[in-house]
Amino acid sequence: MKDITLVIPAKFESDSLPKVLNELKKFSVKKIIVIPKNDILTFKSAKKYDCKIIFQKKNGYGSALRQGILSVKTKYFCIFNADG
């Protein structure tokens, strides 16, 4: 599964994101977490894990997805929810 990246938009998910990222440790996948600039708590939760963190440039779920997808370097990607 090294050819896949999970794109995880995470807006105000500081409680649920660590649970999801702990479960994902079982798999050999890359992870891109897209966080709004003003969401410091989710950033602090995410930075403890092996993942790429991107701060969202524009508001909205679609914008977060687009920005995350454009950052993917693997052959495949999957959209994954931060709340499990």
Residue ranges and their predicted role:
Residues 3-5:
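Cell-envelope/extracellular polymer assembly enzymes that use nucleotide-activated donors
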Residues 12-26:
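Short, well-formed alpha-helical segments that are part of the catalytic scaffolds
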Residues 12-16, 38, 61:
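Donor nucleotide-sugar binding loop of glycosyltransferases
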Residues 35-43:
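A conserved acidic beta->alpha catalytic loop
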Residues 77:
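Short aromatic/hydrophobic "clamp" motif used to bind/position activated sugar donors
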Residues 81-84:
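The conserved acidic donor/metal-binding loop of glycosyltransferases
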